């Protein structure tokens, strides 16, 4: 079993911040913000990136859509929320509560913590950023960034690999 989590953050961040509880997207944001304020660049002088997504192609569903619903406690039933008792299905992107997650991403962009290339970058660019150790946070499936983590490990940068966190939009979601 390998937990996916909804959002991932570098192990170094957790260590430096004293292993804080990160339960909501707002806790996650605060951890990224605090870490980047204290460590704006990597050891080799590269500017850190708060949160990067791979949303320029079909993976938008993996790094944006699925995560948005998971952060609301909605199981991954494709692009739908299924009521287990009635069988009623709803296209998840029409749910009013999903809006808060996308507003949060917009806010992350506004404050400079969302990689501005998140919705335009190509896969090789995305993985190169992760492999460099610059990307503090991810919103992705482990299978999509595991090769980049292998590069980090081969370079002795285990602290730049990612802890998978069960982050939700707010405490009301499980």
Predicted regions, residues:
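Extracytoplasmic/secretory soluble proteins
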Residues: 1-174
């Amino acid at each position: 079993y390998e937990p996916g989590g909804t959002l991932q953050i570098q192990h170094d961040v957790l260590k430096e911040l004293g292993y804080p509880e990160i339960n909501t997207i707002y806790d996650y944001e605060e951890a990224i913000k605090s870490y980047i304020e204290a460590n704006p660049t990597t050891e080799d002088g590269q500017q850190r990136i708060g949160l990067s997504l791979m949303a320029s192609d079909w993976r938008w569903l993996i790094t944006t859509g699925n995560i948005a619903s998971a952060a609301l406690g909605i199981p991954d039933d494709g692009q739908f929320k299924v009521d287990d008792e009635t069988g009623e299905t709803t296209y998840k992107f029409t749910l009013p509560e999903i809006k808060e997650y996308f507003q949060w991403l917009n806010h992350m962009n506004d404050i400079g913590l969302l990689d501005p290339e998140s919705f335009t970058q190509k896969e090789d660019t995305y993985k190169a950023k992760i492999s460099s150790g610059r990307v503090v946070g991810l919103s992705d499936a482990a299978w999509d960034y595991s090769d980049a983590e292998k590069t980090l490990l081969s370079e002795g940068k285990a602290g730049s690999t990612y802890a998978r966190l069960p982050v939700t939009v707010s405490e009301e979601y499980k």
